[in-house]
Swiss-Prot record:
Binding site for Fe(2+): H209, D211, H265
Reaction catalysed by this enzyme: N-[(5S)-5-amino-5-carboxypentanoyl]-L-cysteinyl-D-valine + O2 = isopenicillin N + 2 H2O
Residues annotated as binding 2-oxoglutarate: R274
Entry binding sites for N-[(5S)-5-amino-5-carboxypentanoyl]-L-cysteinyl-D-valine: R84, Y88, Y186, H209, D211, S276
Name the UniProt record assigns to this protein: Isopenicillin N synthase
Segments crossing the lipid bilayer: none
Listed GO biological process terms: antibiotic biosynthetic process
Domain Fe2OG dioxygenase: 183-283
Pathway: Antibiotic biosynthesis; penicillin G biosynthesis; penicillin G from L-alpha-aminoadipate and L-cysteine and L-valine: step 2/3
Length: 326
């Protein structure tokens, strides 16, 4: 029998209320989870995840190979200028999963960051509306919804870190967030590409990594696949398709001087049709939070201040170098 990591379910609704005692209790639970396995489930978030699953499943099944190629990012289709927004292709015999990544809907041709040509900023392209009616509207609304969930969760992190609950708000705004949503499909295949093995012999669909984000807010189909590295080895993360799975990214680890580490996790091989839809909660390009840690935690040497734009650009490149193009 596989062993499971301790991943608590935390009701986050109280973080939107006015009772500070309730907020402090939720923050304490977030603190224990992130200092433990590194993961927790956020319950009572207010998002219709069943609708998200159905819409995304139907959309993936309706996409033609020609559409995928036209939307493919530069790593797959050199004719396209985009590096983040677009389609991430499956590669026969090498890579089974495929995905579509989209960015902040606020980024348009007139946005100051787009005009400035800042790295990691792109105006979203979308599949043809006639073939996929309502897709853009649905996913732009979802971006707003999950952004709001992340903002609520960040109130809990701020309280847990001994700061004002609004601590992250000036850095995390819909106007200029570098956040992204990936609509990842892991298909069932009769002839699955060759698999890599973990050091413990586990067959893997995606190797060990840490998320390049402040926090990650994930919806996934209720099929066991994620594992987290612990002192006891890799443990399965329990599944739920009713709650969001939340973990810290490497920027949270950086600004807390390791108080909240970014958990090392991996995707084990399961040959089943399933979805993974992470929201990578990112700050703005210019945001730079001076690293700190709550007392009595006091590292011998603190981390340097790094702007979020530089962090994200280098972090994504490092992830590709280590694990290959997703």
């Amino acid at each position: 029998m596989n062993r499971h990591a301790d991943v608590p379910v935390i009701d986050i609704s109280g973080l939107s209320g006015n009772d500070m005692d309730v907020k402090k209790d939720i923050a304490a639970r977030i603190d224990r989870a992130c200092r433990g396995s590194g993961f927790f489930y956020a319950a009572n978030h207010g998002v219709d995840l069943a609708a998200l699953q159905k819409f995304t499943t139907d959309w993936h099944m309706a996409m033609s190979p020609e559409e995928k190629w036209e939307l493919a990012i530069r790593a797959y289709n050199p004719a396209n200028p985009r590096n983040r927004n677009g389609y991430y292709m499956a590669v026969e015999g090498k890579k089974a999963n495929e995905s579509f990544c989209y960015l902040n809907p606020s980024f348009d041709a007139d946005h100051a960051t787009i005009k400035a040509g800042l790295p990691s900023h792109e105006v979203n392209i979308w599949p043809d509306e006639a073939r996929h009616p309502g897709m853009r509207r649905f996913y732009e609304a979802y971006f707003s919804d999950v952004f709001d969930v992340a903002a609520v969760i960040l109130r809990g992190f701020a309280i847990a870190l001994g700061r004002e609950e609004s601590f992250f708000e000036r850095h995390f705004s819909m106007d200029d967030t570098l956040s992204a949503v990936s609509l990842i499909r892991y298909p069932f295949l009769e002839n699955y590409p060759p698999l890599k093995l973990g050091p413990d012999g586990e067959k893997l669909s995606f190797e060990h990594h840490q998320d390049v984000s402040l926090i990650t807010v994930l919806y996934q189909t209720a099929i066991p696949n994620l594992q987290v590295e612990t002192a006891e080895g890799y443990l399965d993360i329990p599944v739920s398709d009713e709650h969001f799975l939340v973990n810290c990214g490497t920027y949270m680890a950086h600004i807390t001087n390791g108080y909240y580490p970014a958990p090392v996790h991996r995707v084990k091989y399961i040959n089943a049709e399933r979805l993974s839809i992470p929201f990578f909660a990112n700050l703005s390009h210019a945001s730079a939070i001076d690293p700190f840690a709550p007392p009595p935690y006091a590292p011998a040497r603190g981390n340097p201040t790094v702007s979020y734009g530089d962090y994200l650009q280098h972090g994504l490149l490092d992830l590709i170098r280590a694990n290959g193009q997703t």
